[in-house]
């Protein structure tokens, strides 16, 4: 009985430690980023995190400030973002690196514009 209780406590401790790590992963993604698109243009983005949901700003090529919203799934380090600018929007899907310093993925802009992106933590 004592061994069973010790095993159960160890399992519960591991589970809660994983939850703490998952939240820290989302928190690590908050901050300033540089987004490099497949056409090699580079733009600034800032993200704030609240419980795995992101909000922020993106500066487009015309220097307009655009809104950013999104979410983070800790189990697979997957991030989904949407940038909304005055004349267009972009949907991004990517995966954060283990050290939370880069995010790589793909995007869809307009109706049929697609490509790859890399985000680098500043």
Predicted stretch roles:
Residues 1-8:
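Bacterial N-terminal signal peptides that target proteins for export
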Residues 9-11, 20:
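Cleavable N-terminal signal peptides
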Residues 23-122:
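Central antiparallel beta-sheet cores of small beta-barrel/beta-sandwich binding domains
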């Amino acid at each position: 009985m004592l061994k069973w209780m010790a095993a159960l406590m160890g399992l519960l401790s591991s589970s809660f430690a994983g939850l703490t790590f998952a939240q820290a992963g989302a928190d690590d993604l908050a901050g300033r980023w540089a987004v490099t698109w497949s056409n090699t243009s580079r733009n600034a983005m800032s993200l704030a995190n609240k419980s795995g949901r992101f909000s922020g700003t993106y500066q487009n090529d015309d220097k307009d400030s655009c809104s950013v919203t999104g979410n983070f799934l800790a189990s697979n380090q997957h991030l989904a973002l949407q940038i909304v600018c005055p004349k267009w929007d972009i949907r991004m899907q990517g995966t954060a690196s283990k050290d939370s310093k880069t995010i790589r993925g793909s995007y869809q802009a307009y109706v049929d514009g697609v490509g790859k992106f890399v985000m680098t933590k500043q």
